[in-house]
């Protein structure tokens, strides 16, 4: 609960300090087979954003159970970060252009059909920059 509150309040504190932020979300994916990976739609700002990323918050929602071995990464064009949990923050994108889009990459290692399939309801990022 504290983590969620921190994620929700952090952008307001950053804006008060004169820095910028943008938020983007997309509907999720359905992954039917192990050993395949799928990408979310690119998540990017709708307004011009100059500066470099500082802190990125992420959140995703699944429909149904989490498959064993699920691997979720958040990627820019030049860097990927392994995500631990359905929400959190990272400074791993620090120094990357604030206008660069981000994508979620979903993968379940192994082979064969996923029963039930992995269903992602929603992906969301909040990018803070200066």
Swiss-Prot record:
Keyword Cell inner membrane assigned: no
Keywords for this protein: Bacterial flagellum biogenesis, Signal
Domain of life per record: Bacteria
Alphabetical GO biological process terms: bacterial-type flagellum organization
CC terms in the record's Gene Ontology section: bacterial-type flagellum
Record-linked Pfam families: FlhE
UniProt feature coiled coil, ranges: none
Keyword Heme: no
Signal sequence range: 1-16
Residues annotated as transmembrane: none
Function, as annotated: Not essential for flagellar formation and function.
Protein name per the record: Flagellar protein FlhE
Organism annotation: Escherichia coli (strain K12)
Record gene name: flhE
């Amino acid at each position: 609960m504290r983590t969620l509150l921190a994620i929700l309040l952090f952008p307001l504190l950053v804006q008060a300090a004169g820095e910028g932020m943008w938020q983007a979300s997309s509907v999720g994916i359905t992954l039917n087979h192990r050993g395949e990976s799928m990408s979310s739609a690119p998540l990017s700002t709708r307004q011009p954003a100059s500066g470099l990323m500082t802190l990125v918050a992420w959140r995703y929602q699944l429909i149904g159970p989490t498959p064993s071995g699920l691997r979720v990464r958040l990627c820019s064009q030049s860097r990927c970060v392994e995500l631990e949990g359905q929400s959190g923050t990272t400074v791993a994108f620090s120094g990357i252009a604030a206008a660069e889009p981000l994508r979620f990459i979903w993968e379940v290692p192994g082979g064969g059909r996923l029963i039930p399939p992995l269903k992602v309801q929603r992906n969301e990022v909040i990018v803070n920059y200066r």
